[in-house]
Amino acid sequence: MGVHKKGYLVLEDGSVIEGKAFGAETIRYGEVVFTTAMVGYPESLTDPSYKGQILIATNPLMGTYGVSSKSLKEHGLPLHYESDSIKVEGFVISFLMRPNHWSSEMTLDEWLRREGVPGLYGVDTRALVKKIREEGVMRGAIVTTETDLEEILENIRKISYESTNFVELVSPKNPIVHTPKNVKFRVVVLDLGVKFGILRELLKRGIEVVRIPWNWDILEAYYSYNADGIFISNGPGNPTLLKEVAKRIRKAFNEEIPMMGICLGQQLLALADGAEIYKLKYGHRGINKPVKDLESGKAFVTTQNHGYAIVPESLNEFKVWMVNLDDNSVEGIKHESLPIIATQYHPEASPGPWDSLWVFDEFVKILEGRK
């Protein structure tokens, strides 16, 4: 792997964590968060929901199976990638490993370097995660080039994750259509940073997907594309910045259109319902998060990546469908009278367990009932 120079993670409270730099030689700012996922770093790094964030991995061994080729595809979308490029601002790990896997095309170090993303290894990530868990997520910078760290700290304290619209940075500028071999339905996806894993699950079920930009009128698109339903995707950032989007979603409620939301999509459906959103102290990010379905009484393990949640008492026309068994936060909602469902977690996983792929089947049943 060669000789790696020193690098630093600087936090808004003045803490400076020293490590060894890998990836690109640069400076990147972001909200510092962590994931407890043991595997799936290519999926995590390319997840658009991480835009604007520096990601810490609690699992100490990263890079063990390298980075696979994008030529491995399903429904025309590359496997093990959740978008076309790395979306995190930086990656902080404990050990940078030499890969040994048949599908590996390059090392983690090479991949980050190619995409201009800095990394830091040789860090006690579990101690760092304990700090964030106790004090909450905070702004920071990953520095892998020579610079004045005092100046970096000043810059950190000027940035605001809460007031930045990251969705517009990851949403497409024009519509994108994905067509399966046997089309049963057509769904308009309000693309706020949709994961490829979600698209793959929709396409597997015979759903033609029309991805539209975040600031388009969802109802107008639904009718112009002669769609059967609407899907509100995951995405990065503060949901309360997207109140105009929530208003447009609210208009679609009046048409009784089948709808489904995931992650940010659930939060926007709740905002459209007049509910309140709050920020979690350190978020839910990992692939082993327990969730309970209040209707069936069943529990399952899920993949999660969110920093905000719904205030359950503030829901009006929706009811709580699922809850997180760690902190009882809202993980799923259903409309009381309209064909609308949503989850806060990611039923497609990617990476993670497939315990809740059935949620997509529930959406298909709703579409079938309205056909």
Swiss-Prot record:
Q: What domain of life does the native source organism fall in?
A: Archaea
Q: GO terms for biological process?
A: 'de novo' pyrimidine nucleobase biosynthetic process; 'de novo' UMP biosynthetic process; glutamine metabolic process; L-arginine biosynthetic process
Look at the named UniProt entry and state the broad enzyme category this protein falls under: ligase
Q: Name the pathway.
A: Amino-acid biosynthesis; L-arginine biosynthesis; carbamoyl phosphate from bicarbonate: step 1/1; Pyrimidine metabolism; UMP biosynthesis via de novo pathway; (S)-dihydroorotate from bicarbonate: step 1/3
What's an example of a GO molecular-function annotation for this chain? ATP binding
Q: Which residues form the Glutamine amidotransferase type-1 domain?
A: 186-371
Region CPSase, residue ranges? 1-182
InterPro entries recorded: Anth_synth/Amidotransfase, CarbamoylP_synth_ssu, CarbamoylP_synth_ssu_N, CarbP_synth_ssu_N_sf, Class_I_gatase-like, CPSase_GATase1, GATASE
Q: Which reaction does it catalyse?
A: hydrogencarbonate + L-glutamine + 2 ATP + H2O = carbamoyl phosphate + L-glutamate + 2 ADP + phosphate + 2 H(+)
UniProt keyword list: Amino-acid biosynthesis, Arginine biosynthesis, ATP-binding, Glutamine amidotransferase, Ligase, Nucleotide-binding, Pyrimidine biosynthesis
Give a yes or no for keyword Ion transport in this entry: no
Q: Kindly identify the residues recorded as the active site.
A: 263, 346, 348
List of residues binding L-glutamine:
49, 235, 237, 264, 267, 305, 307-308
Give the E.C. number(s): 6.3.5.5
Checking Gene3D superfamilies in the record gives: 3.40.50.880, Carbamoyl-phosphate synthase small subunit, N-terminal domain
Its subunit composition reads: Composed of two chains; the small (or glutamine) chain promotes the hydrolysis of glutamine to ammonia, which is used by the large (or ammonia) chain to synthesize carbamoyl phosphate. Tetramer of heterodimers (alpha,beta)4.
Family affiliation = Belongs to the CarA family.
Under the heading NCBIfam families, the entry gives: CPSaseIIsmall, PRK12838.1
Q: Which HAMAP family match?
A: CPSase_S_chain (MF_01209)
Q: What does this protein do?
A: Small subunit of the glutamine-dependent carbamoyl phosphate synthetase (CPSase). CPSase catalyzes the formation of carbamoyl phosphate from the ammonia moiety of glutamine, carbonate, and phosphate donated by ATP, constituting the first step of 2 biosynthetic pathways, one leading to arginine and/or urea and the other to pyrimidine nucleotides. The small subunit (glutamine amidotransferase) binds and cleaves glutamine to supply the large subunit with the substrate ammonia.
What is this protein's record name?
Answer: Carbamoyl phosphate synthase small chain
Gene that this sequence comes from: carA
